[in-house]
Amino acid sequence: MSKIRVLCVDDSALMRQIMTEIINSHPDMEVVATAPDPLVARDLIKKFNPQVLTLDVEMPRMDGLDFLEKLMRLRPMPVVMVSSLTGKGSEITLRALELGAIDFVTKPQLGIREGMLAYSELIAEKIRMAAKARLPQRSTTAEPTKIIQHMPLLSSEKLIAIGASTGGTEAIRHVLQPLPPTSPALLITQHMPPGFTKSFAERLNKLCQITVKEAEDGERVLPGHAYIAPGARHLELARSGANYQVRLNDGPPVNRHRPSVDVLFRSVAQYAGRNAVGVILTGMGNDGAAGMLELHQAGAYTLAQNEASCVVFGMPREAIAMGGVDEVVDLHQVSQRMLAQISAGQALRI
């Protein structure tokens, strides 16, 4: 079996060395070349035709974002960003995902070598996934998002739960942007490390008609609001009297993830049941599949993103295979379908 060919681009000689060491330690991949900046990388891409690029976010001569934008326009290929755990780093990384990067890994703030080596399996997993991923389709013209109209005011009992992983930041944006302010509350788990979820929520809040925020423990769940699970904390739905409430916990990872989609879906099945719609979007692995089955069995209507519009079809595929999905839809139909089901209650249940 041929190895996955990787080009590493980083202005730090130490990082290039560490990434090479990590990647070459896995038998199914190899670093074919390294570059200290995007201008050198441009020539090496032509020479070595790599399958995956790892790209530092902040570099001299041409920064990672400028290079990524040009690359995705002229020679689209799977890119895994390497980002710092800073506010600026998270903002740039989210912009990179918007431009078409498949995923990202974070540099530890202290003990670079030890920290990166500890991420060896995760880095290898992201490279394997990137090599097989479907590149996000970038629109050539920026069309304004059409807000869904004629959404009646609904009972505060109505709720939407969304789970996503790889490719999910852009998928979630596509789902939330058309929603009117009268939408029901949304609880969202996106696999993402601490330090990124707050920036992600703030970015979405600027783009959407609804209010988008990082979830806080104990706050009341309100219509017209979307609550994003904080990195490294499970997000659950709870009740306080007649109202829904956010619960955050630091329990062990589920399906290797914290936050976990299964944890969210199971709590929504318990407390919202047939008042809920569950949505599983693009992502690697099986997190959310068992929880979606519980949602389905509790009477919720369940949607999965179709393979053609997923960056990675892993999570939707597993949910479909378990029998917990009512309807499989293209990403551009998700917003309309979930609101239609919320409005119709169980009348349109398949």
From Swiss-Prot:
EC number, as in UniProt: 3.1.1.61, 3.5.1.44
SMART domains: REC
Predominant place of localization: cytoplasm
Modified residues (4-aspartylphosphate): D56
Record-annotated CheB-type methylesterase domain positions: 153-345
PROSITE patterns documented for this protein: CHEB (PS50122), RESPONSE_REGULATORY (PS50110)
Keywords: Chemotaxis, Cytoplasm, Hydrolase, Phosphoprotein
Reaction catalysed by this enzyme: [protein]-L-glutamate 5-O-methyl ester + H2O = L-glutamyl-[protein] + methanol + H(+); L-glutaminyl-[protein] + H2O = L-glutamyl-[protein] + NH4(+)
InterPro entries in UniProt: CheB-like, CheB_C, CheY-like_superfamily, Sig_transdc_resp-reg_Me-estase, Sig_transdc_resp-reg_receiver
Domain Response regulatory residue range list: 5-122
Taxonomic superkingdom: Bacteria
GO CC aspect terms: cytoplasm
Free-text domain note: Contains a C-terminal catalytic domain, and an N-terminal region which modulates catalytic activity. Domains are connected by a linker of approximately 25 amino acids. The structural disorder in the region homologous to the pentapeptide-binding site in E.coli may be related to the failure to bind pentapeptides.
Family: Belongs to the CheB family.
Name of the protein: Protein-glutamate methylesterase/protein-glutamine glutaminase
